[in-house]
Regions:
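Phosphate/dinucleotide-binding and metal-coordinating scaffold of catalytic cores
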Residues: 1-225
């Protein structure tokens, strides 16, 4: 895979237009071989060797090649960057691949229960869109509609929230994280909005993504700066 477009767009900042994803890479309209990208791209992937190995086996790539993995799961990453395979690039740029797949309450509850014991269960092979979330805790990324419903987005449409169920290794982490984020906001610090949600018999923390903004054209990805 070559990286044909590796840019972010800073929304609402002084500098507008394309900027390099990495400060030491100049902006060029050329294809760069994936092998030339440093291991820092691995920071966009989950912190789970087991999960990365399973993805590598599923997509027939090396678990040590972050760009190869992101080419399959990186259409929705942190910030404004998207990793899009060359055969899908035209459809993504034109909006042809834009989709929103509604999820029922029961489906979300099942996903939250499954991902507690198996991080790879966050997505199925037939799901629209693909996301990659950094960190060690199991989580899923979804788009929340204005009516409170949830959807899987694809193409140019980004996820807006991250849902994390409780983990056996972190007792009470939902209450703790919600409290800490609310406390930070109360004392004037910049912090993401979070709340505890119950979906049937499944609990999770719902965190509104700080790298997504609402515009007249809908939800947009924003550079995490």
């Amino acid at each position: 895979m070559g990286i044909q477009r590796s840019v972010t767009r800073t929304v609402g900042a002084r500098r507008r237009g394309p900027i390099p994803c990495l400060s030491h890479f100049r902006w060029r309209r050329t294809v760069r071989p994936a092998r030339r990208y440093p291991q820092c791209c691995g920071g966009l992937l989950p912190d789970s060797e087991t999960l990365l190995q399973r993805w590598a086996s599923r997509f027939h790539v090396s678990a040590r090649n972050p760009v190869a993995l992101l080419s399959h799961v990186g259409e929705d990453c942190a910030g404004a960057v998207q990793f899009v395979r060359s055969e899908r690039l035209a459809a993504v740029l034109s909006g042809e691949s834009d989709r929103q797949e509604p999820l029922s309450t029961h489906e979300i509850a099942q996903r939250l229960q499954r991902v507690r014991v198996d991080q790879a269960a966050a997505r199925r092979l037939d799901d629209v869109g693909q996301f990659s979330l950094a960190g060690a805790q199991a989580k899923i990324a979804l788009l929340q509609r204005d009516d409170g419903g949830w959807e899987f987005p694809a193409g140019r449409i980004p996820t807006t929230h991250i849902l994390k169920p409780p983990s056996g290794d972190y007792d009470g982490f939902i209450e703790n994280e919600v409290f800490c984020l609310h406390l930070a906001r109360h004392v004037g610090m910049s912090a993401a909005f979070a709340e505890m949600i119950c979906v049937e018999d499944a609990q999770a923390i719902s965190v509104r993504r700080y790298d997504r903004i609402r515009t007249a054209a809908g939800w947009q990805r924003a550079a995490a700066v």
